[in-house]
Amino acid sequence: MKNTYYITTPIYYVNDVAHIGHAYTSVASDVIARFMRFCGKDVMFLTGTDEHGQKVEKAAINQNIDPQTFTDKTSQNFRDLMVAMNISNDDFIRTTENRHKKAVAVFWKKLLDNGAIYEGFYEGWYSVRDEAFYDESEINEDKLAPTGAPVEWVKEPSYFFNLAKWQDKLLEFYELNPDFVRPISRRNEVISFIKSGLKDLSISRTTFHWGIKVPNNRKHVIYVWLDALVNYISALGYPDKQSNYAKFWPANLQIVGKDILRFHAVYWPAFLMAAEIPLPKAIMVHGWWTNEGQKISKSLGNTIDPITLIDEFGVDQVRYFLMREVIFGADANFARNNLITRINSELSNKIGNLLHRIVSFVYKNNDAKVPLIKSGVIDKIYELPILKTAIKFAQENILLMDKTEINKILENIINLAEDANIYITNEAPWNLKTTDPDKMLEVLYSLLEVLRYIAIMLQPFVPNSANKMLDQLGVSKEERLFKHLVRDHALKAGSNILEPSIIFPKFN
């Protein structure tokens, strides 16, 4: 069984301004990638930018620059976002790179050789904003697509992909793989769309030039979505069987927003089937963000800049909020007060305060060392309810991540911190110092050990802060994986701890 794990974000369209939706997708994918690394997996984590299409060509013309210069500039905005959000991607693919163009040409030829592509004439509705074709039944009386994007009637020669042929095979695949698309509401949406009847898909354009040329007819450029979807394998070195493609494909998880579900859950599987390439194992679909209950749009002037939030509150605080606030897959609402409440109530009061109280007490009252207690006493401590809860949550969190229930993992961690705060209040080590010094050392050790569990489990979510916590506790950098959340890797009695410092400050 392969110990690899391949996760992808969608590649971001360079015409967009990096916003909270991009940050959310990137952080969620990053949390999963980091989590799998802490599980001991060999992880490949991909993100990047989608840089071709009519919309990009028009934007470049409007700025009086060539499209490549335009995309070089705008792609950098997304690289900057990855750095700012502390995203640990292993690769960043651009669809204007030669490695991608070569892979797309090979993929096209494979479809052509397999009889999945034919030449014809397209006449129908097209949205430049969505870079998508729409059926007559999907267009409202104002000539808008379901997304609200304006559409135009297009007539041009085109190559077609025989999508209709794959309808029954797609339905059969969904029947055999019920967890391929999550959550189930999105799976049902996809199945309903397929059952409504698939039509062959136009996959080339002749009315603009900014794209990858069709290998067998350079008057055409390849449809931007066919081009873009291939990024998930081009970044691995497709079709080279000696590359990461052989090692990591099929992807374990592809994260997408609900607005691009059809492309990833209908077109992409059909393309792969036609090219005789294995399908990814799962697609996880997340919702949209609103701002104080209002739809986010440039025209309303209520877009949320994640960089501004990071500058004000800190990267770990913003990462935590994005993952804690919403059930992954559902829509979410950004409210500034909720962000501040999450930081103050959970990170500062429940985790930060617990750490500071315990480490300060040990630092002052035990010569800055983990209490020197015997191995048999540590065994006894591991029978305490608080340690049993820590072990249970550590095991449960692995299962929760398999179901992408990210916010529940954080809920477990916060519940453990709450239990530890109750435990320290009930045991009152400051009183035991004079009445029962040995018991005081046991209580302090058990609390330090619970903090070790909390900090190790927090690492995928708030990496910088969790590492500071582990540094304060004196946990070596070699013992911070999830496999170390066991009795055999408990804190070493008598080892040094660092002078405490505030890790999660409060905000007004």
UniProtKB/Swiss-Prot annotation:
EC nos: 6.1.1.10
Main location: cytoplasm
Pfam families linked: Anticodon_3 (PF19303), tRNA-synt_1g (PF09334)
One biological process term in Gene Ontology: methionyl-tRNA aminoacylation
GO molecular function term, any single one: methionine-tRNA ligase activity
Cellular compartments annotated: Cytoplasm
Catalytic reactions of this protein: tRNA(Met) + L-methionine + ATP = L-methionyl-tRNA(Met) + AMP + diphosphate
Keyword vocabulary terms for this entry: Aminoacyl-tRNA synthetase, ATP-binding, Cytoplasm, Ligase, Nucleotide-binding, Protein biosynthesis
Top EC class of this enzyme: ligase
Residues annotated as binding ATP: K298
One Gene Ontology cellular component annotation held by this UniProt entry: cytoplasm
Sequence motif 'HIGH' region, location on chain: 12-22
Kinase among keywords: no
Transmembrane segments: none
Subunit structure comment from the entry: Monomer.
Function text: Is required not only for elongation of protein synthesis but also for the initiation of all mRNA translation through initiator tRNA(fMet) aminoacylation.
PANTHER family reported for this sequence: METHIONINE--TRNA LIGASE, MITOCHONDRIAL, METHIONYL-TRNA SYNTHETASE
Family in the record: Belongs to the class-I aminoacyl-tRNA synthetase family. MetG type 2B subfamily.
Protein name according to UniProt: Methionine--tRNA ligase
Provenance organism: Rickettsia prowazekii (strain Madrid E)
